Structure formats: structure tokens, C-alpha cells
Amino acid sequence: CTLKNCPYLRDVDKTDLVLERLGCRVHRAGNIVTVDTRGMCDCKICEDLMREMRSSIIFLGAIISRCKKAVVSMPGGCPIGLRPIDLHLKALRELGVDIQEEHGYIKCSTDKIVGGNIHLDFPSVGATENAMLAAVCAEGFTTITNAAREPEIVDLGNFLNCMGAKVRGMGGSVIKIEGVSKLHGAEYTIMPDRIVAATYLAASAITGGEICLKNVNPRDMGAMLHVLLDMGVQLRIEKDKIIQKAPKKLESIHIVRTMPYPGFPTDIQSPFMALATVARGTSVFIENIFENRFQHVDELTRMGADIKVEGRSAVVRGVNVLQGANVVARELRGGAALVVAALAANGTTTIGGTEFIDRGYENIEKYLLECGAKIRRE
């Protein structure tokens, strides 16, 4: 397979390494990655790679589909909450997979994967992806109800169909899959990253600037764009372009609740909270997805933000200006929030823990520098 528009990210590098450890050949030329799976000879992902990347659990459905067995350890990733994988395992069991959990390892085996009816108690993106990957080569039909509706699910379904799968209903709450005997290689262009796009909109908005984003899908960003409009920014939306002009002083957001798509994404909550720290008035953030996604609050407070957290709610009272400080990113999106806040702060801000930011942002300092930011990496 050849994947285009594949960013340089720490998580992508780790994914490439997982594939190579499994026996696949991976070649990158710029933003094009080619994967040859014909030499795949292993069905186990080593613990050190699983520990570093939460999304590594998505390999489970694909490996069991191909090899009829798989061994992985419990995944790691950013420390933003419990994020149990029971939904993933329940979905695979519905397809006839026997799963044993022993000493931190997940051992899966089956004689054959058989289509079934999978109901997700929560519309988990990862569990939906795992179910899709396992079911595309199952015998018979599979129906996934209460499926995640995120644009990334649509993108995965389109990619699988390019390889010969028969998946329909992506983007809705019911996905139907007719199993095929095997998939074939394909060339596919990965969708633009809507969270990265929204982060750059936040970076421009907090400085009262103007920005033009190209190669984006505005239709996938509705909830985020509505919040920006409520804060007083001006937006001009074109097919694959967003042009934003921000006021000198942003308005408060009032109440933002993170929800599964098409609601407001949990992944952009932190950068938008950075916006609220210097907005006029009080904003309230209610985090409904992860129970530990306010780790950036203490660091923003070090910069002079006025934020009070109680349970899953954070009340942000806008201040006139933030002050530069030494802060530390403790997870990916919280790190992005610190970068956004630092752009508008008086003085110099030094951000540690940049390895978290590199998990989800390609050369963030390069693109911000091109937009006029004073930023460098040491």
C-alpha cells in the first residue's frame, strides 16, 4: 500500500517500527509511506512499543484478521485517563475470537473470524476501528451499532474499500461490513488532520492574527468553528480552505462540552481552553470523554491564568494577559495548549516535554515561525 499525506509524527514513526518488527517492509519518501506486508512473519507486538503508543491496540484487529492469532501487551500513550480497552475486546469476541488476559498480555486466537452483530456501549473510535479491521475479512456479514461517527472512521472505511473491502455506513451510527476473502494493495491519500488545523486556528486567534489554512476539510470541523465564531472571530469557509481573522480581544466561550462526533472534540479542549484564558468573561469546559484531561491547567495557572477545576468541569476567568513561564507538557494536547498560550504571553515561555507534542504535530515550530511567531527548539 502507498499512503500519501502521511505526516512526520513520533507516533507514525512508532507505527512504522511496529510494522517492521512484524516483518513488513516500510519505506518513506517525504510524506509518502509505502508498506509491503508480504513478508509479515510475526503476530506479537513487543511490550516496549505497546507501552509508548495507545493507538497500538488498533493492530490487534488487523493481526488477528490476518494471522488468526495475536499477542499484545496493554497499551500506553498519554496519561489522560483510564481508557479501558474492554470495548475492543468485546467487539472481537463477537467475531469469534478467544481472548485471554494473562500477566498484562492479551492473547487472541481463533480458527476463523465469523461475522456478527457488535454493539458498542460507547461510540469509541478505537473500538470501532478495531472491529472494522477484524471484520473486513470475516466470513459473512458484520453490523456495528452505536459506532463512532468521526471523519477518521469514514477515512478508514474508504481506505479499506480501496483495498477491496465492502464497508458501508461510515459516518453514521450503524456500519455494515460484508467480509471478503482478502484485501489487495492500494494507493490512498490520508485526510487532513482536523485537530491540527483547529490548533493553528487557535494559535492565530489568541494573538489577534489572520491565517489561511489550505488542504483542510471545513465540513469535518463544524463544532470547533462554531466555538470560534462565538468567540468573535471572522471566518470565510471555502471547499478546502479556512480564512480566519481574529479580534483584538476574544469573547468567552460560555459552556463547552466535549462529546463524540459531531460534538466538540476532546482533543481540542486543551488548546481552546488556552484561548479562554485571555478572553473577555468566564468560560466553562465540561470534559465528558476522559477523566484526567485537565493536566494542562496547573501549567496555564503558572502563566497567570485563572482556572478552577472541580471534577470534570473547569471554570476559566479571562485575564488581561498571560506571563511567560517555565512549563512542562504532560500529554499531547495539553502541550499544544501551552504552545498556544505562550504565543500570547508577555516575555519568554520555555516548554518542556516536547516529545508529547511531537506525537501529534509535525514541525509545529516551523509552521508557527512561518506565521510570525518567535519560537525555537533547543
PLM region spans:
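Short, structured segments at the rim of ligand-binding sites
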Residues: 1-378
